[in-house]
C-alpha cells in the first residue's frame, strides 16, 4: 500500500472516539487501530476521517468483531508493519517478526522501543 500522508496509530478506544483522539488523527491518511475497539461505530467514525486497518482485542466480542483479525500484517510505503493487541502474544502470534514495526496495545501505557532494528510501539489507551 502506498500513501502520501501520515499514519496514525490508536488503541483501546473501548467504544468511544474522544474528540482529542479524532483531532490528533485529523491529518492522517491511514489509521491503524490495534484492538479493543469496543463497538463497530468506532471504526465507522474513524473511517470517516481516513482509511482504517483494525484488529480485534480482548474486549471485542460478538458477530461484528469477527470482521477483524487477531493480527494483521501490512506493508506501507515499503515499511513492514505487524499488528497484535497484547504484547505478551507477540512470541506466539507473531513468531516470525521479519518486519520493521510491531504495533500493540492492551496495557494502556504508551511504549516505544527499538530492538534489533524493529520498532515496538504502543500508543497507549485512547478510551475510558
What kind of feature is each model-predicted range?
Residues 11-15, 35-37, 57-60, 86-88, ...:
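Active-site metal-binding loops of divalent metal-dependent hydrolases
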Amino acid at each position: 500500500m502506498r500513501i502520501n500522508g501520515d499514519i496514525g496509530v490508536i488503541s483501546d478506544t473501548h467504544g468511544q472516539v474522544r474528540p482529542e483522539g479524532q483531532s490528533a488523527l485529523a491529518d492522517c491518511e491511514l489509521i491503524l487501530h490495534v484492538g479493543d475497539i469496543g463497538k463497530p461505530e468506532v471504526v465507522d467514525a474513524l473511517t470517516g476521517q481516513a482509511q482504517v486497518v483494525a484488529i480485534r482485542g480482548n474486549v471485542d466480542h460478538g458477530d461484528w468483531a469477527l470482521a477483524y483479525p487477531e493480527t494483521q500484517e501490512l506493508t506501507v510505503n515499503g515499511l513492514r508493519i505487524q499488528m497484535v493487541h497484547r504484547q505478551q502474544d507477540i512470541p506466539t502470534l507473531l513468531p516470525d517478526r521479519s518486519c520493521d514495526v510491531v504495533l500493540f496495545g492492551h496495557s494502556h501505557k504508551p511504549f516505544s522501543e527499538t530492538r534489533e532494528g524493529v520498532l515496538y510501539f504502543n500508543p497507549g489507551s485512547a478510551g475510558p
